[in-house]
Design a protein with these regions (language model features):
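A short, structured loop/turn motif at beta-sheet edges
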Residues: 36-38, 51, 64-72, 101-106
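Short, solvent-exposed, Trp/other aromatic-anchored flexible loops in extracytoplasmic proteins
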Residues: 77-109
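Short acidic/polar inter-strand loop motif in beta-rich domains
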Residues: 113-123
Length: 125
């Protein structure tokens, strides 16, 4: 019985390695902060590609009321204009996102998201 279980676990791990290579990365966040003077988010983006010239933008979701803490909240998807760029080198870039298009009244909670699973939440006064 134990032998079959070990074979099954080995097959699952081999299939996982074949379908999801270790080199697959996604855009992620380094430092994230709110700049009160310019009313912008300052985000250090960590990403892989063939060049450092990626451009990032925000796609706002709908404002959600009734969040924990009593503040309205919104999800903002961070989009990479070169999301299909082959992942050859590591890069980082400091990006400033304007909050003019934020659909929630302030103060509010913003959750930044990148595909497939990275997120960062902060409160904007």
């Amino acid at each position: 019985m134990h032998g079959r279980r070990h074979v099954l676990v080995g097959l699952i791990l081999a299939a996982d390695a074949a379908l999801f290579p270790a080199s697959v990365q996604a855009d992620n966040f380094g430092r994230v902060r709110y700049d009160r003077q310019t009313d912008r988010l300052v985000v250090t983006m960590l990403y892989r590609g063939t060049n450092p010239g990626h451009t990032f933008s925000l796609k706002w979701g709908e404002c959600q009321t009734g969040q924990s803490g009593g503040l309205p909240g919104v999800n903002a998807e961070v989009l990479d204009d070169q999301f299909n760029d082959p992942e050859e080198q590591d890069f980082q870039k400091s990006v400033r996102f304007s909050l003019k298009g934020m659909p929630c009244p302030r103060p509010a909670t913003i959750t930044l998201r990148t595909a497939p699973r990275f997120f960062y939440t902060l409160t904007i006064p």
